[in-house]
Amino acid sequence: MTHKQRAIFEPALVRTALLDAVKKLDPRVQWRNPVMFVVYLGSWLTTLIWLDILSGHTTGSAMFTGSIALWLWFTVLFANMAEALAEGRSKAQAASLRGVKKTSWAKKLSEARVDAPQEKVSADSLRKGDLVLIEAGDTVPCDGEVLEGGASVDESAITGESAPVIRESGGDFSSVTGGTRVLSDWLVVECRVNPGETFLDRMIAMVEGAKRRKTPNEVALTILLVALTIVFLLATATLYPFSVFSVEASQAGSPVTITVLVALLVCLIPTTIGGLLSAIGVAGMSRMLGANVIATSGRAVEAAGDVDVLLLDKTGTITLGNRQASEFLPAPGVTEQQLADAAQLSSLADETPEGRSIVVLAKQRFNLRERDLHSLNATFIPFSAQTRMSGVNVQERMIRKGAVDAIRRHVESNQGHFPPAVDDLVASVARTGGTPLVVAEGSRVLGVVALKDIVKGGIKERFAELRKMGIKTVMITGDNRLTAAAIAAEAGVDDFLAEATPEAKLALIRQYQAEGRLVAMTGDGTNDAPALAQADVAVAMNSGTQAAKEAGNMVDLDSNPTKLIEVVHIGKQMLMTRGSLTTFSIANDVAKYFAIIPAAFAATYPQLNALNIMQLHSPSSAILSAVIFNALVIVFLIPLALKGVSYKAMSAAALLRRNLWIYGLGGLLVPFVGIKLIDLLLTALNMG
């Protein structure tokens, strides 16, 4: 689904966000953000002091106290609005998904047969394990697995892809998603979820930012911010008795007021990152959805940013896929036509692009027409990840084709001999980056079919970028080591796993994790499920099986394996945004310190005027300028929090240096300029 990226300050979103920001003033909502809760309490306290001054019970400047109270409320509202804007974008996405979810009827079957007795029931009443018949024109009532039949399915409501897809029993394209529509033929489907647990329900829940759980890094950062807040709270609280004692000892000036202390506390605690932290997390999930990837939690997005090993399937990710048969290379004593005949027979029921291309090449080279497997009384042997070969049993002939090691075992188990000349042919094809497919009949090796693999344009440069970021790329392929090595060298990956089985892939993930690395991978088949469940970031293809989608912690609606690289970029961007704004927020304190400390204590200690390096007009304008800047900086940083900081492929050390210069130095200098400009404006308006 190509989700339209909404403008940050779109009028409809802003109106809703303003209303939500006011609703969030409820203390039951505010206490969830400890830093902003302190500002919230300070707002109430200064408001009560202002009302007390107006009633005549307390002396002080009503104008100054009222202005401080007003801008403290603005600080809380701006932080609420940042979160509300992020949630508003997610809610808009969730609303569009809800539009897909319609009340529909289902044809419930008593058993898994197309002609079984059926009962018309509401889709909402279906439970896990129920069997349904879905015919042309019907909406798929639940997420499930196809047990019988095959059909063309329109998944545009979920994926945004207008071209229909084929869903059929068996293989890796047997799962259907509730809310999609069958265009032709029929399917018998077993429901795999209960109501409220469908993929569409999970998508809606995932993009509902208000209901998301905090990620581990977010929790850790919140603890740090709370600790800083407590330190500054204790420091500020001790200033009042210190001020009273100083005035009595020096017989000069007057004690610092509660209003000034509240202003000082609010300016010193990390309100900028405290106000934007939740918005950054919600926006990260939203950006992931914008890339057509559904993450099960913010934890998954965050883990993507920490990944340092990518396991990438060769076919479809590194190469274009759809390998094409290019040449028949017969073994000694075998003619090319004999090899082509056997290869075509073994591929007649093979619906893979490779199998189709073998049939076509045999036609083109020797005018071998397709033959009907049923009329030949043939039994097709499907490919499996364990045997790594397929074939056909026909008229006493046992033909197999597959990877060289698989055919070698097959031939030797039938008391045959694997000719060294065929090993040479295999090596020759592999050295050129092709994939050798060995064909055998019984215990006799007939030769090799050469399959061509084309590496995607620009993929080498993308891997070079990942290397700069400290991410190791590992190509996963079922090819032999020579072929894998040739393609790995051409694509520029760091390592490869050849002749991969599900067990080998799982073992490799565990090996990297034992070294303290975080691993990301993609998968679409049931055989990928164990590895997907083990990986730290597991992106399942939407076109894949239900088992793969349940094992992963992300689902790519476009079913594009290359998307894994983009997922890592989005995760890193979210972590960088959080870190950059934290640096900026803490660096801000320095300028506010130079503004407020002289203003608060210079009357008692005139020597502190030396710290007034900005030459602010008066103590009241200095304090008010710092409070106003503290509020406005949240507004100016909302776009950055929602869009994310600009991301460039470079090492972690280089990124740290770059962000310290931009956000650390920027956080030091910008407040000096901003506070001075606000002070000049207040003075011009006679408000200082």
Swiss-Prot record:
Keywords linked to the UniProt accession: ATP-binding, Cell inner membrane, Cell membrane, Ion transport, Magnesium, Membrane, Metal-binding, Nucleotide-binding, Phosphoprotein, Potassium, Potassium transport, Translocase, Transmembrane, Transmembrane helix, Transport
PROSITE patterns in the record: ATPASE_E1_E2
Residues annotated to bind ATP: 350, 354, 383-390, 401
GO biological process assignments: potassium ion transmembrane transport
Membrane topology: Multi-pass membrane protein
Xref: InterPro entries: ATPase_P-typ_cyto_dom_N, ATPase_P-typ_P_site, ATPase_P-typ_TM_dom_sf, ATPase_P-typ_transduc_dom_A_sf, HAD-like_sf, HAD_sf, P-type_ATPase_bsu_IA, P_typ_ATPase
UniProt main location, coarse: membrane
Localization: Cell inner membrane
Catalytic activity, as annotated: K(+)(out) + ATP + H2O = K(+)(in) + ADP + phosphate + H(+)
Enzyme Commission number(s) of this protein: 7.2.2.6
Single Gene Ontology MF annotation: ATP binding
GO cellular component terms attached to this protein's record: plasma membrane; potassium ion-transporting ATPase complex; potassium:proton antiporter complex
Coiled coil stretches, renumbered: none
Entry-linked SUPFAM superfamilies: Calcium ATPase, transduction domain A, Calcium ATPase, transmembrane domain M, HAD-like, Metal cation-transporting ATPase, ATP-binding domain N
Active-site residues from the entry: 313
Residues involved in Mg(2+) binding: 524, 528
Transmembrane region(s): 34-54, 62-82, 219-239, 260-280, 594-614, 622-642, 662-682
Domain of life: Bacteria
Assembly notes: The system is composed of three essential subunits: KdpA, KdpB and KdpC.
Similarity comment: Belongs to the cation transport ATPase (P-type) (TC 3.A.3) family. Type IA subfamily.
Purpose: Part of the high-affinity ATP-driven potassium transport (or Kdp) system, which catalyzes the hydrolysis of ATP coupled with the electrogenic transport of potassium into the cytoplasm. This subunit is responsible for energy coupling to the transport system and for the release of the potassium ions to the cytoplasm.
Protein name per its UniProtKB record: Potassium-transporting ATPase ATP-binding subunit
Protein's gene: kdpB
